[in-house]
Amino acid sequence: NYNYDEKYILSAVIRRDGSSRLSKNIRWGTFPSVSVGWRFDKEKFFPISRDVVNMFKVRGSYGVLGNENIGEYMYQTTMDRNNMTYSFGNQVVTGSAVSTFVDNNLAWEKKKSTNIGIDLALFNNRLEFTAEWYKNVSEDLLYSVPVPANAGVDNEVVTMNAASMENSGFEFSATYRNYDHALKYTISANLSTLKNKVTSLGFSTDRFITGAYATFVGQEVGQFYGYVYEGIARSQADLDNHVNDNGVVITQEGAGIGDCLYKDVNNDGRIDSEDQVVLGSGLPKINFGLNAHREYKGFDLSISTYGALNYHVSDDIYNSLNSSYGYSNKDVSMLEANRWSEDGIYLSDKPRTYIVSNGEAWNNYFSERMIQNAAYWKIANVELGYNFPDKWFKGIVSGVRAYVSAQNLYTFTGYKGYNVDYAGGTFTPGYNFCSFPSAKSFMAGILFTF
């Protein structure tokens, strides 16, 4: 660390880490970082009065971090004796053989971060601003690469250092404090943006598609991938007149009244896997927070909130309960739906159900029906407290505080899942797989300070 006259600031760190999860010859990694800052307001030529600008700092940093969040010994080949036989001396004998394909050169993931920002304090530090641009480049990402079916091994995927991506955006924060009167308060807000781009998937491929999620080089990671939903066939006329952009009637073999209709994207007159397209993103483009704290004659109130905008979620529980196919549990609305009228026109906004597969189960195709706008604003914490006057206790205790608080009080959202705070995977960021709901909790207590 170096600080010259509180104007020029330098900090540098270098660390060396090793992990037994990585291959022996490359399990050690060196990770440096450096940051610099310049207090522009400390210069003699700074043109604005110190009474107005209390701090004007320009800063920048660069650093490298390592990650090896994988299982143990995934770089080691294993032998299997299960049903491994061969002929020896005109007899069938048991042997061993390599049963899985592994990468013997697993190394550290590397995250290279660049940040440039300014810090500004005004009016005797009452008003503070920060603004920052960031770019994070992740290289040698450890992820599951498909193994060719003709490889002669048991595993379908293998963990390798095979991908790279970039995340960039801006972060802003503002805080205002007023402690000059009996009513004291602090208000703060923060906002960050995100732009994600996959720069490489390795091994001469430009795409990685797994089920309802697709990653393309040059685009966002783990986008939703499926069919464009065009409504429900309410009558035979809807089926007969369902045409593509060329006016050709679209063939959906086995589809009937009450089934979902999809767009013929490639205009070949039929619905198949070639009609799948990117449907949306599971990465929030904007994250924000709003917080407030007030004090008045011993009372204090704190409110903490946060939220996210411009992204979608596929909720596994919701989609399963509202699926039109299978024997598993269903939402009661599947029974309550008014599916037919007296003249045979299908009225429900839910497609017809299948107990067993009969041809194409069209209503279970992954489409826009199965993703939801997950924008939300969550009141995360509210606490009201009172600090009793010290004179009441005459030195027995130095302080007494009573408080009540609530966590996860309410979430403003149209999302129908149980939890907006789910954690998706690297290549499935918008997939909420059975995450537990956030418990709403209330507490009351008294804090004694001696």
Enumerate the language-model features and the residues they cover.
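Glycine-rich, aromatic-lined ligand/substrate-binding cores of catalytic
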Residues: S281-D315
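Conserved SET/PR-domain catalytic core that frames the SAM/AdoMet-binding pocket
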Residues: S188, V198, E274, P284-G298, ...
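Short helix/loop capping segments that flank catalytic or ligand/cofactor-binding pockets
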Residues: N69, Y225, A237-D238, S302-S304, ...
